[in-house]
Amino acid sequence: MEGNLLLEQFSRYKKLELEASPFHFLLDAHIELNPHQINAFCTAIDALKTGGIVLADEVGLGKTIEAGLILKHVLELGAKRVLIALPASLRKQWELELYDKFELDSIILDRPTVEKESSEWHKRLTDNTSIKIVTSYDYSSKLMKRFQDVKWDFIIIDEAHNLRNVFNGTKRAKNLYELSKGIPKILLTATPLQNSLTDLHGLISFIDQRIFGSEKV
C-alpha cells in the first residue's frame, strides 16, 4: 500500500513539474502519462542534441507513447520531415496511434504509391509543410535514395533489434544505417540484447558509431 501511495505522489509531482516546464503542451495527449514515460521523454530530448537514443523499455511499458511525446516535441521545435521506419505489419497501428493519442496525422507510403505520382511526392517532401511518413524498413531506404535532396529532420526506428546486425547482416540494416547518418533519431526495442553485446553495438552505432568504436572494442 505504501509503495502505491509513493508512486501516486511521485506521479503527481512529475505532472506538476511538466505543467510548469516548456513541455506543458504534452499534457494535451489523450493518455495518462506514467513517471517513467516522462523521465524517458526528458532524457531523450536531451540525447537528441548529440544524435539520439535507444529506448529499451520492456514490452508493455509504452515505448510508442514515449516516441509520440518526443515526436510532438521535435515538431514543436520546427521539424518538418519525419520518417518512421518499422516492420510493414506495424504501419497501420502506428498511423492510428499517432492520431488517436497525439492528434498527429501521418501518411503510410510504399513503392506503388510513390511510383504512381513520383513528382508529386517529391514536391510534398521538399516543400515547407510538415509531413510524417510511416513506412517499412526496406522502403525507408529506397525512399531516401530516390529523393536524396529531401532533408529529413527526425527518424524513429521501431522494433530496432531487427537491424542490430548492421555491420555483418543484411543490406537492409546497412542501407538504413548509412542513409540516416547525421539525422537525429530514436530507436525503440524491448530486446536490445538478444545474442551478445555486438547486438547493442549495432544499435548504438545508429546513433553514434564513436561511442563503442569497432566491434572488437
Regions found by a protein language model. Give the residues of each.
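SF2 helicase/translocase NTPase motor core
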Residues: 2-42, 63-66, 75-172, 181-182, ...
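Hydrophobic residues on the short alpha-helix immediately C-terminal to a glycine-rich phosphate/catalytic loop
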Residues: 44, 58, 70-74, 94, ...
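Phosphate/ATP-binding catalytic cores across multiple sugar-kinase/actin-like superfamilies
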Residues: 47
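Short hydrophobic/aromatic beta-strand immediately N-terminal to the Walker A/P-loop
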Residues: 52-56, 83, 186
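Conserved helicase ATPase motor motifs in RecA-like P-loop NTPase domains
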Residues: 183-196
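A short helix-turn-beta junction within AAA+ P-loop NTPase domains corresponding to the substrate/partner-engaging
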Residues: 200-213
